[in-house]
Amino acid sequence: MSCKESPHVGVSTTTVSSVAVQAGDSKIVIAVVKCGKWVRLQLAEAQPNLLEIGSSQDETRKLLHDHELLLAKLKALEDRVWGLLQEADRTAEANKEQSEVYDAMAQTLGEAWATLVSMLERRRELLGLTSEFFQSALEFAIKIDQAEDFLQNPHEFESAEALQSLLLLHDRHAKELLERSLVLLNKSQQLTDFIEKFKCDGSPVNSELIQGAQSSCLKIDSLLELLQDRRRQLDKHLQQQRQELSQVLQLCLWDQQESQVSCWFQKTIRDLQEQSLGSSLSDNKELIRKHEDLTIKAKEWDLAMEKLKSQALGILLSKDLTEKEHLQLSNQKLNRLQEEFGRLMVDRKAWLTMAHDFFTSANEAFDVLGKVEDYLKLLKSEGLSLPALAAKHEELHREIKDSTAAALQKGRTLISQVDSCRAQVTGIHETMGRIQKRVDRLSQQCTAHQEFALKKQQLATSVDDYLRKVEMSVQEMRLVLATTLDVGSSPSESEKILNKYLELDIQAKETAHALEAAAKITTEKNELELNEVALLPFKVKRLEEELSTLSRSVSYRSQVLQTYIAFRKSSEEVEEQLQSLKEFYLTESPWEDEDDAVVTCQSNSAERKWQLFLKKSFLTQDLSLEFLNLISMAKENEILNVKKEMHIVENVMEKQTNGREELSRLRMAWHLKAMEGKPVKERWETFKEKLKKTTHNVKLLHEVLMPVSALDLGGNLQSMSDLRRRWIAMQPQLQQLHEDVQQIMKEWEVLSGQGVPLKEKAEQLKDLIHLHQRQRERIQEYEEILYKTVQFHQVKEELTHLIKPRELELLAQPMELEGSKEVLMQLGRSQGRRAHVDHLHRLALSLGVDIISSVQRPNCSNISAKSLQQQLEALELDSRDWSAKAKEYEQVLACSLEYCTTREEINELKESFKDIKKKFNNLKFNYSKKNEKSRNLKTLQYQIQQVETYADKIQALRKKMEKVNKKISDSVLSYPSNKANTLVEAMEDLKKHVDDFDKVVTDYKMNLDLTEHLQEVIEECNFWYEDASATVVRVGKYSMECQTREAVDILHRQFQKFVTPSVPQQEERIQEVVSLAQRLYGLEEGQKYAEKIVTRHKEILESITELCGSLVELKEKLMQGDVPKVNSNLEDFHGNSIDLLKEPGRDEQTTFSEERSEGQAQGADVSAINGTREDGLPVGLRQSFDKEDSAQGLTLPEDTLSGEDSECISSDDISLPPLPVTPESPLAPSDMEVEEPASSSALALHISGYRMRTGTGGLGKAPESVLPPPTAFTDGYHNKKDTFTSHFERPYPQFKAEPLLTSRGSGEMSTKLHVNVKCPARMPREVHDKALPPSSQAQEISLGTQEKVHADSNVTKTQDRLHAALDVSPGLSSQSDTSRSHQRQVGPQGDRKNSSAEKSVVSLAGQAPHFSRLLSNVTVTEGSPVTLEVEVTGFPEPTLTWFKKGQKLCADGHLQVLHKDTKHSVFIPKVCEADAGLYVAQAQNSSGTLSSKAILHVTGNHGPPITRINWIVLCIIYVSVSVIYWLLTQ
C-alpha cells in the first residue's frame, strides 16, 4: 500500500519506520515512508497475499480467522495512530512554520491508515466471499454426488406412476443442479469481480497483488470448471437416463392406452362374435340400432387407435429405442384387432341386414303358410278326384316351397356365412326350424300329387316292364318264325313241332295279354294326365301290330300242323276201318242155315261200321281240303316242299276215295249175296219198301236242296263255315242215300232176272234215278261252290287283317330307325307282307271268279253271288290302294336305307379322318420329343416322307368324300329336307375339318422342307468353313518354308484363286441361312439361330484377311531380308489358324465319345498303321515335311515355275480346292483319271490324311478316333441336291471301306476313275513309282478290295461316312500326302454328287430323284451270284431304268430286276463273262433325272491272290466300321 502521489514527483522517498502485525499464519508489514513533506503508510509485506483466497473452504476459513485476528491487532494500533496524529497536530500548532508540513503529514497518514484499514476490510470481505463461494461449491459438489448416487443406484418401478415419480426426481435433481450451478456461478462471478476490483483499486504496480489475483482467479476457475465438468457429465447422463425413462414412460403410457384400446376392441370383438342376430324381426331391429350406436362409438376408438398408431410410428422412428420389436408386435396386434374389428363390424352389419331380410321373409312365409293351411282344410271338405286334388296339392306344395324357399335359402346362406359363430344364429336356427316344421306338417297334408306321381311312375314302370317282356317275346317268336315250316315229317315229329308252336301260341296270347295290360295301363296313365291326349304310344301300336302279325303266323302254322296231323291220323283210321270192312265183306258171307237174328246182328254191326267209315272218310276229306286251303294261303317259302305236300295229300284222298268206292261195291255185293237166300216174294216186298223209303228220302233231299230264298254267298266267314259244317255233316247221309239208290238199282237188276213183275215200279224207279242224278250233280256243284266260298272268305278275312286301316296308318308313319340294318329288316318285312298280300289277292280273285262263274250255271239258280261280287270288287280296290301305299312305304324305307347307308359312310369317313389326324399328331409329337442330336437330316427326310404319306391319305379321303357328295347330290331330292340338310351339313363340317387339317399338314411339310433346306445350307457353310480353315492352315504352314518373294507371291496368288470365287458364294449362303431361320423361327429367334454361323463366318474372313496381310508382310520382309522374324510371326498365325480350325467342333451336335471308348483297340491298330500322332497329324509331317513333300508333292504348271522354286515348297502343294477352269488349269476334271494306289502304305496314307483333316480342321472332339469322321462332316451332309455353282457348293466324295477314288468332275457317279499326271522332273523315279503305281496293278487290287467289301459298302451308314477320295486341283499332279490324299467328307449316305454328275438341275429345296445308296464297282468270279442295288427316293416317286452298255436291261431267265419300296436291284444268280460291263441305274421323275453307274468285272477262277497285308487292312477296316456302325445305331 502507498500514499497518494505527491505533487513533487521527482522527490525521493525515505522509509521512516515499519510496523509488523502477525496473527497465526497471516502477517503484514507496514512501512512509514516520507517523501518530501508527505508521509505515507505503505504495505510493505503481506503473508498470505491480500488476494490469496485459499484452496478450500477450511483453508479460507483459517485465512479469514487469521485475518480477523490480524485486523483486530491492527485495530488495536489505531489509537496509537490517532494519538500520533494528535501529537502531530500539537506539534503543528507548536510549530506554526511547519504546520503545513505537519498538516500534510497528518492528512496523508490518516488517509493511508484509512486505506490500509479499508484494504484489510476488503480482504476480510474477500475471504468472506471466498468462504461463501467454497460453501456453494461444496453444496454443488454434494448435489452432484447425490445426483451421481441417484444415477448409479438401480431404480425399480412397477407402474407408470412410479416411473413418473422417478422422472420427477430426475427433474428435481436436474433443477437443483442447475440452481446450485447458478449459485456457484454467481458466487464465482461475484468473487472474481471483487478480486478484479480489489486488484484494480490497489497499486497498479504491485505485482504481488496481481499475482495473488491471478492465483485466486485460477483457483476459482479450476474449481468451477471441475464442478461444471462433473455437472455437465452428470447432466448428460441424467438427460440420457431421463430420455430412456421418458421413452419407457412413453411406452408404458402407450402400452396402457394400447391395453385399454385393445381390451375395448377385444371385448367388443367377443361381443360381436357372441351376440345373437336376433330371434325375431323386432329383436333384430333393436340389434341393428345398437350396432349403429356401436359404429358411432367405434369411430372414437378408431381415432384413439389411429393416435396410438401415429405415436407408435413416431416412437419407432426414434434411433435409440431398444424395444422396437415389442412395439412393432403391439402395433401389428392393434392393426390385426382393427382389421378384425372392421371385418366383424362389416360382417355384423351384413349379417344383421341378412337376418332382417330373413325375418321379413319368414314373416311373409308364415302368412302364406297360414293361408295354405286354411285352404287345405277347405279342400278336405270338397272331396275332389285324385287328379284334381293332386293338381291342387301340387300347386299348394309349390306355393309352400316358393313362399318358404326365399326365407330358408336366406337362412341357410346366413348360417353358412356365420357357421363359425353358432351362438349368433341360434334365433335363425329356431326360426328356420319353426318354418321347416310347419312346412313338413303342411307337406304331409299335401301328398295327393306325390301319390299321383307315384302312381304314374308305377304305371310307367309297369308299361316299360310289359313292353320289355313283349319285345323279348316278339324277338323269340320272330326267330322261330324265321325258319321254314316242315310238315312232311313223321307224325311224332310233327306233334313235337306242333307242341312248340302251341307253346309259342300260348306265349303269344300271354304276350298279347301283357300288351293289352300295357295298353290299359297306358290308357289309365293318359286318363290321369289331364293335359295330354289319351292315345297309345306309337311303340305300343307297333308292337301290337307286329305281335298280331306274329300271332297270326303262329296260329296259322299251328292250324296247318293241327290240320295236317288230324288229317294223317284220320286217314290212318279211315284206312284201318276200310281194311276192316273190306275184310268183313270179303270173308264174312251170310249163310242160309244161320239164324236170322245172327245175320241181322252182323248186318247191323257192319252198317254201323259203314256209317262210321263214311263219317270218318268225309271228315278226312274235309281235313285234306282245309289243309290244302291253308297251304294255298301260305307265304312264299313259308312251308317246306309245298307242292310235294299237296301232292301227297291229294294222293291220299284219291286213294281213300277209290277205297271207299271199292268198299261200297263190296258192301253192295255182300247185301245182294245176303238176299239171295231169301224168297223172291220177300225180296220183292223188301225192294218195294226200300224203293218207297228211298224215293221219299230223295224227295226230301230235293226239297232241302231247293230252299225258298236264294242262298247269299256274300255273308261272313262264320255263316259260310257253319253252312259248310252242316253240309259236311250231311255228306254221310247223302252218301248213304246214294248207296241206297245204287243198291235198289242192283236189286232191280237181280229181281228182273228172276221174273219178278217190275213194270209197276219201273216208272217210279226211273224217276228216282233221274231225280237222284240231278241231285248228285247239284250236290257236287254246291259242294264246290261252298268250298270255294269258304276259302274265299278265309282269304278275304286274312287280307282284311293285312290291309286294315290300322295297318295303313302304321305304313303311313314309318318309324325312325337308327341304323341301316333295322331299315333293311323293316324293308324286307314290308316287301314280304306286300308279296303275301298280292298272293292272297290273286287267290281271292281267282276264287271269286270261279264262284261267280259257277253260280251262273242252271243248277245254281237259287244261289246269289252279287254281294260276293261287290265284296270282291271292294277287296280288289282296297288291295290296290294298300299295295300303292305299301310301295310308297317301301320307297320311303328305301330312301331311309340309302340315308342310313350314306350317314354310316360319312361316319366311317369321320372315323378315318380322326384316325389319320390322331396318327399325324402322334407323328408330330414323337418328332418334337426328339432332341437336337436325333433330328439329323436323315430323320428329317424320313419325317417328310411320313408327312407326304399322310398327305396322300388325305387326298384319298377327299376322293371318297367326293363320291359321297356325288351320291348325296344325286339322291338329295329323294330325302326329306331335314335329312338332306343333315347330310350336307355333316359333309360340309367334315370338309371344313379336312381342309383345316390339310392346311396344317401342308404348312408342317413346308416347314419341314424349309428346315431341310436350312440344314443343307448350314452343312454346306460348315463344309466351306472346314475347307477354308484347313486351307488357311496349309497356306500359313507352307508360307513358313518360303525363302523368296517370288515363292510367297505364287502362294499368295494361289490362295487368292481359292478365296475370290468362294467367299461371295458363302456370303450368299449365309444370307440364305439368315432368311430361312427368320422365316422358320421369327426375326429374333432366327437371328439367334444364325448367330453362330455368322460369327464363324466372320472369324474365317478375319483369318483369311490376316493370312493375306501376313503374306504381304512376308513379301515385304523378304525384300528386306528379315526372314526369321517373319517366320516367327507366321508360326504364331499358323497356331491361331489351327485353333480356329478346331474351334467349330464346339458347335456340332453329335459326339463320338462312345466310338472312342468302344473302339480304342481298333483305333490303336490303325494309328500304328497310319503312323499318326495323337493330334491327328502324321508323325513324319512335323519331322520331315520337305522329304514327304518331295515324295508326294504336285507339279506346278510350267508357267509358274522359276529358278527359285527349290527354296520353297510349291505353292500348289497346299492342296487348295479345285478352282474354276482357268488358263492355269488346262485340264478339266472330267479329263482326269486317278489310278488308285493298292499298297497298304497308300491306304495308310489315306487314313492318316483323313486323321490330319479331322485333327486340324474338324471338330476337335475325337482326335484319337481313326475311322469315324466328325459329325459336322457326316450327319449333316446326306440328301444333298444336285446343282452346285462352285467347289464349296458341291459335296466331296467319301472314303469308303475299299480304297477307291471318285472323280468329282466326271459325268456320272462312278467309283472307278483315273488321273493321268506327270511326274516332276526332279522327283526320284522310285518315289514316283511308289506314289503312282501302274494302272493295271491298281485296278486289280482296287477291284479285289471292292469285291470283298461289296456287301457292306452300300449298307452301313458308317461305311458311307468313311468314303473319301483324292481331290486334285486342275493342272496338278496326284498326291498321296495326308494334306492332299483325302478331300472333303460328305454325308452319311454316301450320295454326294457334283454339278455335272447326273446332268440334272434341281433346286436345293426340290424333291428330285436322290440316291441314298449308290452303285459301286464290283469284281466277281465267274459262276458266282452278284447283286447291283440302289436306293432312290423323290417325289413324285421316281421311275428307275437299268441300262447295260447303253441298252435297256430287262428281266429274263438269266437275271432278275427287282423292286421293293425304294430299293431297286439287279440279281444275277450265275455270272458269266458276257455280264461284264458298265451298268447304269437311271432314276427320273418330273423334278429331275439322276443316274448312278458301276462296272462289273468278271474274272476266272484263277484270279490273283490277295496279299496278307491287304487282307489284314481290310479286316481292320471292316471290324472298325462294324463297331462304329453298331455304336451309332444304339
UniProtKB/Swiss-Prot annotation:
Location(s) in or outside the cell: Cytoplasm; Cytoplasm, Cytoskeleton, Microtubule organizing center, Centrosome
Post-translational modification: Ubiquitinated and degradated by the CDC20-APC/C pathway. During brain development, CDC20-APC/C complex degrades CCDC141 after centrosome translocation into the dilated area. CCDC141 is restabilized in the dilation until the centrosome enters the dilation, at which point it is once again immediately destabilized by CDC20-APC/C complex. The oscillatory regulation of CCDC141 protein is needed for proper cortical migration.
Domain of life: Eukaryota
Record-linked InterPro entries: Ig-like_dom (IPR007110), Ig-like_dom_sf (IPR036179), Ig-like_fold (IPR013783), Ig_I-set (IPR013098), Ig_sub (IPR003599), Ig_sub2 (IPR003598), IgLON_domain (IPR050876), Spectrin/alpha-actinin (IPR018159)
Claim: Phosphoprotein is one of the keywords in the record: yes
Listed GO CC annotations: centrosome; cytoplasm
Biased composition (Polar residues): 1334-1345
Region (Disordered): 1153-1240, 1259-1285, 1324-1356, 1369-1403
Keywords, sorted A to Z: Coiled coil, Cytoplasm, Cytoskeleton, Immunoglobulin domain, Phosphoprotein, Ubl conjugation
Oligomer status and interactors: Interacts with DISC1. Interacts preferentially with phosphorylated forms of myosin regulatory light chain (MRLC). Interacts (via the N-terminal region) with HDAC6; inhibits the deacetylase activity of HDAC6. Interacts with KIBRA (via the C-terminal region); retains AMPAR in the cytosol after internalization.
Summary of the function given for this chain in its UniProt record: Plays a critical role in cortical radial and GnRH neurons migration during brain development. Regulates cortical radial migration by negatively controlling the activity of histone deacetylase 6 (HDAC6) and promotes centrosome maturation. CAMDI is required for dilation formation of cortical neurons during radial migration. Plays a critical role in learning and memory performance through regulation of AMPA-selective glutamate receptors (AMPARs) cell surface expression in competition with KIBRA.
Protein name: Coiled-coil domain-containing protein 141
Organism per entry: Rattus norvegicus
